[in-house]
């Protein structure tokens, strides 16, 4: 992948174990967002391989990408909610696309909203929610399909310390039930006390892989 005529990522090699939780850090423009987009198939690499469950997903045909994305939940800093749809409708979108039945959609959307503490806001529009609540809607949408992997791109970037801590605890809860979690963040204070691996990107190169203190 290229940014401004140069490679956004160069020689990046790492392995994330199934069921692992890890953090991805680096300065603005280091390549964090690009790496997450490559993993979930939003962007394609110009060279190299990306293996998911033993399969090279960088060579998937366009029609195969949706099947990959059903196994990966993606959370964005600006959460990409549809402001003219209810909270319930926003969370239901991945299930509707996947062709789930009405009963299955109702059950799983309710479970996802309950998990993030927003079941009572299901009929609200996103504009009626706080920034932290909107981010939790984005998280519910990402996990409603029960993905094997959860990717989060600066999910606490616009939130205060208390809300950020709550979001991180949510990710830890998902991880405890077996979901693999990779969270990109520049908030080193938030993650420094967590016992998870920290992968650091700088100028498109990866460093570290150490465990937080």
Which residues make up each language-model segment?
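Conserved ABC transporter NBD signature motif
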Residues: 48-56
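A short, proline-enriched helix->beta-strand linker immediately N-terminal to the Walker B motif
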Residues: 144-148
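Conserved ABC ATPase signature
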Residues: 125-129, 133-135
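Helix-to-loop junction immediately C-terminal to a conserved catalytic motif
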Residues: 40
